[in-house]
């Protein structure tokens, strides 16, 4: 009985030792959009924290100087810098305001993409519906 309890405790320690919290950040600007946008003064940041065991992602994003109100904001992927990709996670509601926070539970595939540096944050406006500012998420 004691041996089984010790074995179970050891297994829990092994699982806990593999769990990790990973932080990401992105600096968004119009020059990193694909193609680049003419939006002088538009800028933003996005940060995220991922629990690799639960696949839970907490994020926050802020922006300023856009050509108009944000109409949408998302994390996109998988894509290398300079490439476009589909939406993975919405940032805030439609017509999000800055700053905004939120969370999502990712799939294993999404975790692999994010940790490989294949996601970017993107804020859209009416003048730039494909995205006005963008930044690649990188591990901190």
Predicted regions and their residues:
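Gram-negative bacterial Sec-dependent N-terminal signal peptides
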Residues: 1-18
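Metal-centered catalytic cores of metalloenzymes
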Residues: 18-73, 77-140
């Amino acid at each position: 009985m004691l041996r089984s309890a010790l074995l179970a405790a050891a297994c829990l320690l092994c699982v806990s030792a593999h769990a990790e919290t990973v932080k990401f950040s992105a600096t968004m600007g119009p020059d990193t959009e694909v193609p680049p946008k003419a939006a002088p003064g538009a800028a933003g940041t996005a940060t995220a924290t991922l629990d690799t065991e639960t696949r839970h992602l907490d994020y926050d994003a802020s922006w300023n100087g856009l050509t108009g109100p944000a109409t949408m904001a998302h994390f996109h992927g998988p894509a290398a810098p300079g490439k476009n990709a589909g939406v993975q996670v919405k940032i805030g509601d439609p017509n999000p305001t800055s700053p905004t926070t939120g969370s999502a539970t990712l799939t294993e595939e999404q975790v692999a993409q994010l940790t490989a540096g294949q996601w970017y944050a993107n804020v859209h406006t009416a003048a730039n519906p494909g995205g006005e500012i963008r930044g690649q998420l990188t591990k901190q």
